[in-house]
């Protein structure tokens, strides 16, 4: 059985993520989606909790017709030491043979650890990016909804994600500066 790892922050998940996951599942039997920066939330760069992101991913993949029995989603907190982070990923995830990533630094870490690393499939990256979704949300621009699956938009609305992001971006959500 071939199992792959697909790490990302997914702040929030968008159609590009769904496309990439569907493409990777054409090449492997199972996929471990690692939701990184799991301890961060309620800040401008990371407004959603790990649980909310896992929920959004699950609903987005269900909406896209992905067989969820082939996907395992896990939270991965960051640590300051990158080799410790790599060990944590290996500890939290079921065994995997290949890593799909678009991040050159993540690719370097896994390659040096002996893993096969492949470029994650990209889908209109200039259009579909979590950064863009967050920027549109902060501005109150309804175009953000076109970039995410309907289920993700519904969750963001249900949890007050746009307001949370606007407040966080105003600088009130920086406990390390209090």
Curated annotation (Swiss-Prot):
<keyword id="KW-0963">Cytoplasm</keyword>
<keyword id="KW-0808">Transferase</keyword>
<comment type="similarity">
    <text>Belongs to the archaeal NMN adenylyltransferase family.</text>
</comment>
<dbReference type="GO" id="GO:0005737">
    <property type="term" value="C:cytoplasm"/>
</dbReference>
<keyword id="KW-0662">Pyridine nucleotide biosynthesis</keyword>
<keyword id="KW-0548">Nucleotidyltransferase</keyword>
<comment type="pathway">
    <text>Cofactor biosynthesis; NAD(+) biosynthesis; NAD(+) from nicotinamide D-ribonucleotide: step 1/1.</text>
</comment>
<keyword id="KW-0520">NAD</keyword>
<dbReference type="GO" id="GO:0000309">
    <property type="term" value="F:nicotinamide-nucleotide adenylyltransferase activity"/>
</dbReference>
<dbReference type="GO" id="GO:0005524">
    <property type="term" value="F:ATP binding"/>
</dbReference>
<dbReference type="GO" id="GO:0009435">
    <property type="term" value="P:NAD biosynthetic process"/>
</dbReference>
<dbReference type="InterPro" id="IPR004821">
    <property type="entry name" value="Cyt_trans-like"/>
</dbReference>
<keyword id="KW-0547">Nucleotide-binding</keyword>
<keyword id="KW-0067">ATP-binding</keyword>
<dbReference type="Pfam" id="PF01467">
    <property type="entry name" value="CTP_transf_like"/>
</dbReference>
<protein>
    <recommendedName>
        <fullName>Nicotinamide-nucleotide adenylyltransferase</fullName>
        <ecNumber>2.7.7.1</ecNumber>
    </recommendedName>
</protein>
<dbReference type="InterPro" id="IPR006418">
    <property type="entry name" value="NMN_Atrans_arc"/>
</dbReference>
<dbReference type="InterPro" id="IPR014729">
    <property type="entry name" value="Rossmann-like_a/b/a_fold"/>
</dbReference>
């Amino acid at each position: 059985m071939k199992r792959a790892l697909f790490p990302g922050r997914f702040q929030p998940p968008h159609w590009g993520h769904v496309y990439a996951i569907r493409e990777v599942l054409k090449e492997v039997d199972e996929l471990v989606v690692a939701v990184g920066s799991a301890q961060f939330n309620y800040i401008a760069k990371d407004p959603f909790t790990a649980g909310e992101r896992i929920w959004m991913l699950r609903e987005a993949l269900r909406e896209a017709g992905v067989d969820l029995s082939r996907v395992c989603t896990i939270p991965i907190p960051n640590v300051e030491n990158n080799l410790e982070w790599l060990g944590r990923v290996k500890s939290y995830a079921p065994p995997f043979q290949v890593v799909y990533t678009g991040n050159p630094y993540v690719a370097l870490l896994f390659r040096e650890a002996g893993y096969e690393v492949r470029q994650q499939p990209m889908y209109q990256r200039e259009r579909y990016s979590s950064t863009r979704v967050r920027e549109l949300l902060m501005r109150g621009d309804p175009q953000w909804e076109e970039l995410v699956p309907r289920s993700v938009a519904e969750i963001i609305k249900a949890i007050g994600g746009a307001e949370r992001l606007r407040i966080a971006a105003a600088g009130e959500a920086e406990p390390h500066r209090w």
